């Protein structure tokens, strides 16, 4: 159940994002376990994500980040445990009902051959077909493409785009869906610095308007810069959850990633840097 009363407000950009009090629980996972055969991928995971916050899932390869995101989205049924979305169990909800409450950006894009970029973004509006919200389809698509910096690619066939351009088109499609929970799996992996910042700035803006945002990131400095809380996963367990300053300590990061790391502050930013030997010392050895 949601732990706080909710109130209705209206997004200044798309009109629907901020329909919940920012501190109300959007997603709640309890005792989530996922096993594939004999292999346990997630073990006893508990996590709450609130409206109005960005939560970053970080951890080494194979830690269970993408699996947890899929469980939170309702795309993967856990072996045991429960996930609630705005107080309702995710399990058993119809796909359209889920799609009107949460949007998912998957790690591997499978955009259909032959579609133009704008057509792909318009697919995000399909869940609102034959509803009053459909009247704003063009407006919302225009906004999403501008925010994702893909307006100039509108008429390009998607397979002709670079990997980063395709990733931004997919992000625009997520924005066009215009829902209150955003689940992003490594949205910055194919992007240059400018567009990494742009995507996460928009994720932050969505949260500031009341959305709940969960984002899988490998870059810990990006996670520290843009998230309210960080959940550190390791071997299927959540090792720590808290503010970036609380959990991204050199001790924990070095242990989880099995590599010594520095964590320091620079002009108000928390930076995580792997410890490297100098080239001269490598040559001497």
Residue ranges and their predicted role:
Residues 182-186:
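Catalytic Walker B motif of ABC-type/P-loop ATPase nucleotide-binding domains
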Residues 73:
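Helix-to-loop junction immediately C-terminal to a conserved catalytic motif
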Residues 81-89:
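Conserved ABC transporter NBD signature motif
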Residues 157-161, 165:
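Conserved ABC ATPase signature
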Residues 58-60:
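The feature captures the beta-strand-to-loop junction immediately N-terminal to the Walker
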Residues 27, 42-44:
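Conserved structural motif at the start of ABC-family nucleotide-binding domains
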Residues 122, 135-153, 178:
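Conserved ABC ATPase "signature" region
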């Amino acid at each position: 159940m949601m732990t706080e009363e909710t109130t209705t407000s209206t997004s200044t950009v798309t009109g629907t994002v901020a329909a919940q009090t920012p501190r109300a629980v959007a997603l709640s996972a309890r005792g989530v376990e996922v096993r594939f055969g004999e292999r346990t991928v997630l073990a006893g995971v508990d996590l709450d994500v609130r409206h109005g916050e960005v939560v970053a899932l970080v951890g080494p390869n194979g830690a269970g980040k993408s699996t947890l995101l899929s469980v939170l989205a309702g795309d993967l049924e856990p072996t045991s445990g429960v996930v609630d979305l705005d107080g309702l169990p995710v399990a058993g909800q119809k796909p359209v009902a889920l799609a009107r409450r949460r949007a998912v950006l998957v790690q591997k894009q499978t955009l259909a051959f032959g579609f133009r970029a704008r057509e792909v973004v318009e697919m995000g509006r399909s869940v609102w077909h034959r509803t009053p919200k459909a009247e704003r389809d063009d407006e919302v698509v225009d906004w999403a493409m501008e925010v994702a910096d893909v307006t100039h690619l509108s008429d390009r066939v998607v397979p002709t785009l670079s990997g980063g351009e395709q990733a931004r088109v997919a992000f625009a499609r997520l924005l066009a869906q215009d829902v209150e929970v955003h689940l992003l799996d490594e949205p910055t992996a194919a992007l240059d610095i400018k567009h990494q910042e742009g995507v996460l700035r928009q994720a932050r803006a969505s949260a500031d308007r009341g959305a709940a945002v969960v984002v899988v990131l490998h870059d810990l400095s990006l996670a520290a810069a843009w998230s309210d809380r960080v959940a550190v996963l390791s071997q299927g367990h959540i090792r720590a959850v808290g503010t970036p300053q609380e959990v991204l300590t050199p001790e924990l990061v070095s242990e989880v990633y099995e590599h010594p790391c520095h964590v320091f502050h620079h002009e108000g930013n928390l930076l995580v840097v792997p410890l490297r030997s100098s080239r001269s010392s490598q040559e001497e050895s």
